[in-house]
Amino acid sequence: MVEIIGGGILGLTLAYELLKQGRQVRVWERAPTLGGLMGRISFSELDGMSCDRYYHAILSSDRTLMHLMAELGLRERVGMVATKMGFYHNGHSYPMTTPLEFLRFPPLNMLDRTRLAYTILACRQIKDWRALEQIPVADWLTSLSGERVVRNIWAPLLRAKFDGDFSQVPATYIWSRLVRTTDTRTRGGSQELMCYLPNGYQELIEALATAIRARGGEIHTGTMVDQVQVVNGHAIGLLVGGQELASDQIVITTQTPIARRLLPPEAAEVSTGWGRLDGYLGIVCMLLVLRQRLTPYYTLNITDPSIPFTGVIETTNLIDPACVGGYHLVYLPKYVAPDSPYARMGDDELRTTFMRYLRQMFPDLRDEAIAAIRIGRERYVEPLHPLGATDRIPAVQSPIHGLFLANTGQIYPQLTNGESVCSFARQVADIVASQSRSAAGTRIKPDVTMNLL
């Protein structure tokens, strides 16, 4: 029996892949529902309308994810839409979707635009990313794009993404992001194609759960795993609600700080090793359900440092509003460090603050256009990979025989998204299924972890 701790998309995909290879699995999820960050939220005041708690994109280039959805019978339900992107700069919104709009972007002169275009093209040509992980992203971007482009475009975006401090962020971050997003462009770059499921990622979560149960797997929700049991360097089972359950192998898919709490004193050395790379940013996100469209953009990036949220993401410019009761969904995310004042704000204060800045951007937004508001919070969302992080990434198989760690912090240099998580889960399944319990220390090498390029 393989125990999988965590019922998010990583844990469920891993369980599904292991079942395909003939292994018995049990999935443990402490929340009452599956999906983790990709779960749904319901609005009783809107006749039970539900939508994704947070926004999640499916790109037209997400090959592993598309293959998984095809296996689960979802491929025909995937819609594809040409979306628009904009930039909010100095109090104005500018379209930045087509090459012509790019050339007209006022904050940049012709030389700046040329250098920005060169940066994007240069990223596409880089196949070996290793040298980039030792270079601070700001230094690398300055060498390619120039100081004006960094000051007006890159630095504001990086400050927003990393809650102000991106001094230790390696160049691999921008490289990976640009390579993935430019893969969605049509020939000539005039359109950006994105995909969606009518009922969001919950469709994939439910399809995975159905497939797991159909193949004999077990799923336990609303159940807290107390501790991994270790004897003489072997993981022998779990302690769940005071009951000891014998296991052959255990895979922890939770974020590293949570995973470390599950280890007993006998695993102190492993915990220390995992702790070498366990930094995460959290997120606070205000979701507005509107009765009318706010912008024409799926993503409106923000370069104004006074505005607290990272961007304005209007997902109903991708998904059909009919999928969410005819409403329009706007997400205002802010990534937060543990000591950020926004992480400590109460819901009412956060709502008031975000609405003040949103109305500064959109003065025509009226109260009667707002059907509902929700505040979402998560402590561990974005794993932090500082300069030279590769050697600090924990091995999938730990030195304790039969104990594995598999979470988003080990996905590198690719960014955390549905595609990279599903691809990672497939490769972890191969390791768990094929390696004997006597072999320890196998690491998925970062350069072969993902198959996105």
Task: Identify the role of each PLM range.
Residues 46-129, 156:
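Dinucleotide-binding Rossmann-like beta1-alpha1 core, especially the glycine-rich loop
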Residues 319-325, 378-405, 409-412:
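FAD-binding beta-loop-beta segment adjacent to the flavin cofactor pocket
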Residues 19-44:
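Glycine-rich FAD pyrophosphate-binding loop
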Residues 21, 224-330, 334-343, 348, ...:
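Mid-domain catalytic core of redox enzymes
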Residues 407-432:
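A conserved FAD-binding loop/helix module that cradles the flavin
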Residues 1-27:
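N-terminal Rossmann-like FAD-binding beta1-loop-alpha1 element of flavoenzymes
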Residues 10, 33, 257:
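Conserved Rossmann-like nucleotide-cofactor binding loop
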Residues 13, 108, 117-231:
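Active-site/ligand-binding neighborhood in enzyme catalytic cores
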